[in-house]
Design a protein with these regions (language model features):
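Signature aromatic-anchored transmembrane alpha helix within multi-pass, membrane-resident enzymes
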Residues: 374-382, 428-455
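Hydrophobic/aromatic-rich transmembrane helices and adjacent perimembrane loops
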Residues: 227-228, 234-237, 278, 402-436
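Membrane-interface alpha helices of multi-pass inner-membrane proteins
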Residues: 214, 258-274
């Protein structure tokens, strides 16, 4: 044993070293340890402890001094222990060397085959892709129901349909090739497009659920089903108004100049149906209210720009095509009766819209997702929006009641309901509650609107049963005669291959009819009357060809009576 080993220093048996802390010395069983200890006690000297100095020798690296009577068993260091540096041996009082550890970087873990998505605060959301596809599917079902309600209406042409189809005696384009069926199919396409645009506008203003409820209620209205099966420009005018409304909602966060996209649609609507002119001020107000939350004072610039461009386009249209006729015709209808009829045709939807407006004013959001970020519209803006949408439904009834003219009021009511229905959809959504807590309320409202709409449409959609009359006239008309009838447009349309529209004249009653009969200038006279007029009773110039009664006895239509010149 060297001096350094006796002083507690380090031994250097070779390049390999060992630590006592990790590799304790080898010991014999308990019996040998007791024997060695007994020998140490027997001498009574410090030699026993001197023998224990061999234990200190075991602290050398790569070398072990066994106890007396013990076999030598060397211990080898591992590969990781060979990184320790040579210790400092400056003297007997030198401190033990602190080894420097080599930190090994862990191997990178393999990429997982599947990563769980981030867990949202709630397991429910209204703005994910799945809800969007569900909304589209439900909208398609709503449009199919609307198409079915319109297709169930059938019959010969109305007088206004025939006038629209003849177009001053000349058919053109798609109508010329497809006739009445093609024109009605085109009207249905416009009506379905208006419902789809209404859903889009309501979804942008409120949410998808309110949009679906609004589209569902609008699709079963009597005016919607009627215009979808009525060959006229009313459905086109509704489509243009719905497109303008959707564009106003779509561009509410854009620059004020983006509102110019909606101006052409709004300006064209009155030239398709004059009643659409009543709703241009509503569109102007909505141009401001829809953008005020995002643009502030810039929303008024947007409204002024929309009003100016729309007015300029309307003025140009009047200069080119003239003023639409029929918008200010006075009548003798009872104003009270017109208001009652309007309440029957649109009262249910208007009531639900008022409920939705009140709920919207009281609370901006329903609270299904209280953690949703974003500022809510103010109470004043909510009040103005609800008042504008609900009040618009009253424009056509009040205006025509003031005129005393109930012509096509059952159709014009639908123009105002186009603007009130978004608030009605919001009302249905609020009444069902958060997360569809009370779905039976929405189902009940929809079924009630459906039943009422079907009954009213069947009552109002009663075209003249003119098939038998047209069949009888085919045998007596030609391109040279003159004909007097109560329905000149219908006769001119169905007999357009045999006659010209100018050959058909509108029949009057009283002295005018008596004078025409006495003059004998008409080759045939066709009247819808329950009894024979006095002027034709016993007349020697005309003979009665036939009396054609309608197939629908409950329709209230008078039979056709045909006289031909002798």
């Amino acid at each position: 044993m060297t001096t350094q080993q006796q002083d507690g220093g380090w031994s250097e048996p070779g390049p390999q070293q060992d630590w006592q802390q990790q590799y304790p010395p080898y010991t014999e069983p308990q019996q040998q340890q007791q024997q060695v200890y007994g020998d140490q006690q027997g001498y009574g000297q410090q030699q026993a402890y001197g023998d224990q100095q061999a234990y200190g020798d075991q602290q050398g690296y790569g070398y072990q001094q066994p106890y007396a009577g013990q076999p030598y068993i060397p211990q080898q260091p591992t590969a990781g222990q060979q990184h320790y540096a040579r210790p400092y041996t400056g003297g007997s009082d030198a401190e033990y060397y602190v080894p420097e550890y080599a930190v090994l970087e862990p191997e990178p873990e393999p990429e997982p085959g599947y990563v769980l998505p981030e867990v949202p605060v709630s397991a429910w959301s209204v703005d994910n892709s799945r809800s969007a596809w569900i909304s589209r599917g439900v909208l398609i079902l709503i449009l199919l129901v609307q198409a079915g309600l319109s297709f169930r209406l059938d019959g010969s042409a109305f007088a206004q349909e025939a006038k629209f189809l003849t177009s001053d005696g000349e058919l053109s384009g798609l109508v010329a090739q497809l006739g009445l069926a093609g024109a009605r199919a085109l009207s249905l396409a416009w009506a379905l497009g208006a419902t789809a645009l209404l859903f889009g506008a309501t979804r942008l203003l409120f949410n998808a659920r309110a949009g679906l409820a609004a589209a569902a209620m609008y699709s079963v209205l009597e005016s919607t089903a009627f215009t979808g099966r009525y060959a006229s420009l009313h459905s086109l005018s509704l489509f243009l108004l719905a497109a303008a409304l959707w564009l106003l909602a779509r561009t509410r966060q854009s620059s004020p100049a983006a509102v110019l996209l909606a101006a052409p649609f709004a300006a064209l609507a009155p030239f398709a149906a004059y009643s659409a002119a009543l709703y241009l001020p509503t569109l102007t107000v909505l141009a401001v209210l829809t953008a005020y939350r995002f643009r502030g004072a810039g929303a008024f610039v947007r409204g002024a720009l929309f009003a100016a461009v729309t007015g300029a386009l309307c003025f140009a249209g009047v200069q080119l095509a003239g003023t639409p006729s029929g918008w200010n015709v006075k009548g003798t209808d009872s104003a009270v009766q017109l208001l009652k009829d309007s309440a029957q045709w649109g009262g249910v939807v208007l009531l639900v819209a008022v409920i939705g407006a009140v709920g919207f004013i009281r609370r901006a959001r329903m609270g299904e997702m209280p953690w949703a970020e974003g500022s809510a519209p103010g109470a004043i803006r909510r009040s103005l929006l609800g008042l504008t949408m609900c009040g618009t439904a009253l424009l056509a009834p009040l205006y025509q009641a003031w005129l005393g003219n109930g012509s096509s009021l059952y159709i014009h009511v639908g123009f105002g309901l186009l603007f009130a229905v978004p608030m009605a959809g919001l009302g249905v959504s609020r009444m069902m509650g958060a997360h569809f807590r009370y779905p039976q309320i929405g189902i009940m409202i929809y079924v009630a609107a459906l039943v009422i709409g079907m009954a009213q449409t069947r009552e109002l959609y009663r075209p003249p049963d003119s098939a038998a009359m047209i069949g009888a006239l085919r045998e007596v008309v030609d391109t040279k005669g003159e004909y007097l009838t109560d329905d000149p447009e219908i006769s001119a349309y169905y007999l357009r291959t045999q006659t010209k529209p100018a050959q058909w004249h509108l029949a009057e009653r009283g002295a005018a009819l008596t004078a025409a009969v006495k003059k004998g200038s008409y080759d045939a006279i066709v009247l819808r009357a329950s009894s024979v007029p006095e002027a034709l009773r016993g007349n020697a110039n005309y003979r009665l060809l036939g009396v054609l009664r309608p197939t629908d006895k409950d329709g209230g239509q008078e039979p056709y009576r045909i006289w031909v010149k002798r």
